Amino acid sequence: MKLILKHIAFLGLALVFLAACNTDKLDYPDAYKVADGIPVVKSIRYANTDTYITQAYMNETVCLLGDNLRSVTQLWFNDQKATLNTSYITDNTLLVSVPKNYPKKRTDKIYLITKNEADTVKYDFVVLPPLPNVASMSNEWAAVGEEVTIYGDYFIDDTSSPVVISFPGADVPHADMTFDGSSSVTFKVPAGALPGYVSVKTMSGTSRSKFMYKDSRNILFDWDGSRGGHAIGQGWRNGSKVHRTPGSDPFPAIDGNYICFQGKEVGPGASDVWDEDNLSFNYWPTPGDPLKGELSSRPEFARLIEDYGIGGLQIKFEALVNTPWTNVGLQLVFTSNADVTMAAATNAYFGNVSIARGIWEPWVSAGGSFDTAGKWITVSIPLSDFNKKPNGTASESTLKADSLTGLSFFLWYGTSSGTKCTPTIAIDNIRVVPIG
């Protein structure tokens, strides 16, 4: 009996094995098969509409209409290979996404390649880059004739559609533009340029900058009152000891008076730096005073806080770092009336780890040393990045709307320890403005 059962078991396994082997010979009528012959493209439309097109932006999905499209095994837009999904290919339709990389060499054609690369069919089609993204400018307060760089993406300078950069009142001569790939372009501020947004026009269309040239919105400190900001701070170190007028230093002013932190060698750590006289300024408010009250009570600042919230705002200022900066960070500390006022004077907030602050220390990302090569630059820090303790580690606190009544800058401590240095850091036109 056992022998019979063994034979039955063996026979069952054999049948299973034979059945498995024979599945290779089964015919699946719905399986995708590459067709022979040559594809024919009659038209192209968007994947989700009946609009017929002759061009599309990178990463858009399009639908090729024609005959024998299952013969296509490769599809290229210019010199960029597209990804084919056979689930979206029939004899008469082919859905495909335009590659997200801009071609190195434009031919304005689609190439449809058949099995074994036997044949290549060409079809006229233009790939457009997205609209230019005009993100930032090296110096928003540059003078006419001064060289600046704008940063962003998709600054595609095509011979058939050259880039046009426009300031209010003046365009940049194309011959003055120097491109570094498609992410930045350098030029001189043209004669006649007026304050306002900068626009960049490419073959894809026109985009407006996220910044403003000579941005005078909500300037909190301009150090001479010429832009509606405070001409001096308020507190034990109100800025008078670091206040400068044009001609005070061997480098040029950018917009009248400014402040400059200098004259002190700073070493690593918290205890080897503290010099409020030479390396800081305070603004401690006098609540209710129409001239010396809370910063956040200034009408323009109050409106921006209401409209954009903390997450939609950034602090900006112009800076010139004239000597190598290799150590400590610039602490940017907004304070509330509970932290400090003119009546309740104290500097304890500098070391208070529960007060979240921003820290600017560009020498860290620059490889250990930073200067601006004698030029002014624009510094931008989102208020959402005011989330650090004095040593740069993450704070348990976050910046809130009621924490914007006072402001202090102090060159002290920071996230990293570098080498001793005697930095010279000039600052002007401190402002809080929308991010975009």
Indicate residue ranges for each PLM-predicted region.
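Short carbohydrate-recognition loop motifs
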Residues: 243-296
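C-terminal motif of bacterial Sec signal peptides marking the signal peptidase cleavage site
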Residues: 16-20
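Extracellular polysaccharide-targeting segments
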Residues: 211-222, 413-436
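Short, aromatic- and glycine-rich surface loops/edge beta-strands on solvent-exposed regions
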Residues: 104-116, 193-203, 408-409
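A structural motif
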Residues: 62-64, 75, 94-96, 108-113, ...
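Extracellular ligand-binding interfaces
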Residues: 291, 295, 308-310, 314-392
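Extracellular beta-strand ligand-recognition surfaces/modules
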Residues: 313-317, 329-332, 378-424, 430
